[in-house]
């Protein structure tokens, strides 16, 4: 696996492209929150990706939650780092969004090259 950090000045363009390319793909989302007592809370979500948005203060992703049937949103305030994980064939496999005390890891359930899904309704 290859990991590539996305430069902050590229975040807006990256997320616009990423959302368009991967909208509707099945994902697993893990969120980790660290508290002052050093305990860590973890939440998991499965569903279809609906988009990722970024502004100066926050990165948010929206997923159709399979368990509840509702749109769920996870966000990181004051994001510090965005890392894209890819296979050796440069297929996107995961996205990591790191904040001061929180982290979201989005993993694709069935990663495949984007050109293989062009024109397929998801």
Give residue spans per PLM region.
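Short coil-to-beta-strand transition motifs
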Residues: 36-46, 75-77
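A short, Trp-centered hydrophobic/proline-enriched beta-strand micro-motif
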Residues: 22-32
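Charged, alpha-helical interface segments at or near domain boundaries
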Residues: 1-14
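N-terminal helix-cap/turn-to-beta initiation motif at the start of protein domains
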Residues: 15, 19-20
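Short secondary-structure capping/turn segments at boundaries of alpha-helices and beta-strands
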Residues: 14, 33-35, 48
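Short acidic, glycine-rich loop/turn motifs
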Residues: 31-37, 63-67, 97-101
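Amphipathic protein-protein interaction modules
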Residues: 48-93
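Helix-rich interaction surfaces within compact, conserved domain-sized segments
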Residues: 74-122
């Amino acid at each position: 696996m290859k990991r590539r950090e996305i430069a902050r000045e590229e975040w807006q363009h990256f997320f616009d492209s990423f959302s368009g390319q991967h909208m509707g793909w099945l994902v697993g989302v893990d969120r980790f929150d660290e508290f002052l007592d050093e305990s860590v809370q973890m939440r998991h979500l499965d569903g279809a990706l609906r988009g990722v948005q970024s502004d100066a203060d926050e990165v948010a992703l929206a997923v159709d939650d399979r368990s509840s049937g509702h749109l769920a949103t996870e966000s990181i305030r004051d994001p510090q780092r965005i890392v894209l994980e890819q296979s050796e064939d440069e297929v996107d496999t995961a996205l990591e969004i790191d904040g001061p005390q929180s982290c979201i890891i989005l993993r694709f359930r069935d990663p495949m090259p984007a050109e293989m899904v062009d024109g397929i309704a998801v």
